Design a protein with these regions (language model features):
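AAA+/SF3 P-loop NTPase mechanochemical coupling elements
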Residues: 105-114, 143-160, 171-180
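Conserved C-terminal "switch" segment of AAA+ ATPases
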Residues: 13-18, 31, 169, 182-255, ...
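P-loop (Walker A) phosphate-binding loop of NTP-binding proteins
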Residues: 57, 91, 159
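C-terminal engagement/docking regions of AAA+ P-loop ATPases
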Residues: 1-9, 14-15, 248-332
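Walker A/P-loop
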Residues: 46-83
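Short glycine-rich substrate-engagement loop in P-loop NTPases that contacts/grips substrate
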Residues: 86-115
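Conserved AAA+/SF3 P-loop NTPase catalytic/coupling segment centered on the Walker-B
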Residues: 89, 110-137, 151, 166-175, ...
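Pre-Walker A (pre-P-loop) alpha-helix and adjacent loop at the N terminus of AAA/AAA+ ATPase modules
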Residues: 14-60, 243
Length: 332
């Protein structure tokens, strides 16, 4: 009985603490038309302290979404265009000799920002990708002999263009796994596109985005997200989903046995649990339900399941495999 009361109290507390989510959504909605999934993905990544890999053709408001979020959170934003000639020093910074001081001084790179847009990450060679991914993992960078912490909150939004593969350097599986979420951005609906065109033709310019929350508030909100209740049955459900990617036959998914080259790692289980918690929080609920897990499952697992040559030959996608798993794993 006491647990029920505690859950009720927790739910009321989360409802109070998550009021800013709707305010943030409304503020971003002034500029971003539609793309609710993209906005939710950004919020989940921000609240879970995870990074996001976005896949979508150019012109779908990826840059606009993260710059708008940065303005609404009153945070520092930086955009890095990845090119074949980019060097790690262009990203993290370097030591510059100062004739005035007769000593080397640190010039910090664009990675020192709260929100970093890594545009077309697969356009740069492995050493540059590694520099970014190390910064993402450690949340600090080394320049010369000194290590410098990155500002908090720190969110990397990396983009890949699915159409142009010529002259690209695909991210290795181990490095892709560092991204908590991989979201696919789709085209807007007809009415949404009409609204976008009207907004850009009105001559009034883009609406002003106001600061509605501070970076410190985001860090406090992360602590609150950790208090969102997750029942043991939900934990088991998450573990079952991940194990179904490794041992599909145990879940009556024999047909997937020859289609999956490798499944999700323990990092996938952690990411799925954290993302489900954050999803419950942005839905202003103090406890996780199976629908929260299912809502974030595709984004968490999309880049963590390797396909065999057989699956690729049959044009089977990870989307279909994840859907099959969700349809077969018993929901608590």
């Amino acid at each position: 009985m006491s647990e029920v009361i505690n859950i009720k109290e927790l739910n009321e507390r989360i409802e109070r603490e998550s009021v800013f989510v709707d305010t943030l959504r409304n503020e971003m909605g002034k500029v971003i038309v539609g793309q609710s999934h993209l906005v939710d993905t950004l919020l989940i990544g921000l609240l879970s302290n995870g990074h996001i890999l976005l896949e979508g053709v150019p012109g779908l408001a990826k840059t606009l979404a993260i710059t708008t979020l940065a303005k609404a959170v009153d945070a520092c934003f930086s955009r890095i265009q990845f090119t074949p000639d980019l060097l790690p020093a262009d990203l993290i910074g370097t030591l510059i000799y100062s004739q005035k001081n007769e000593d080397f001084v640190v010039r910090k790179g664009p990675i020192f920002a709260n929100f970093v847009l890594a545009d077309e990450i697969n356009r740069s060679p492995a050493k540059v990708q590694s520099a970014l991914l190390e910064a993402m993992q450690e949340r600090q960078v080394t320049i010369g002999d000194n290590t410098y912490p990155l500002p908090q909150p720190f969110l990397v939004l990396a983009t890949q263009n699915p159409l142009e593969q010529e002259g690209t350097y695909p991210l290795p599986e181990a490095q892709v796994d560092r991204f908590m979420l991989k979201a696919k951005i789709s085209y807007p609906k007809k009415q949404e596109e009409r609204d976008i065109v009207r907004m850009n033709l009105s001559g009034a310019g883009m609406p002003q985005v106001n600061k509605v929350i501070s970076p410190e508030d985001i860090i406090k909100a992360r602590k609150v997200v950790e208090d969102v209740y997750m029942d043991e049955k939900i934990e088991k459900y998450i573990i079952d989903i991940i194990f179904a990617t490794r041992e599909p036959a145990e879940y009556n998914l024999q047909k997937l046995q020859n289609l999956i080259a490798y499944g999700g790692s323990p990092r996938a289980s952690i990411s799925l649990a954290k993302a489900a918690r954050s999803y419950a929080f942005i839905r202003r609920r103090g406890y996780v339900i199976p629908e929260d897990v299912r809502a974030v499952c595709h984004d968490v697992l999309r880049h963590r399941i390797g396909l065999t040559y057989e699956a690729e030959a049959e044009n089977i996608t990870t989307e279909e495999i994840i859907t099959d798993i969700l349809n077969n794993v018993i929901v608590p």
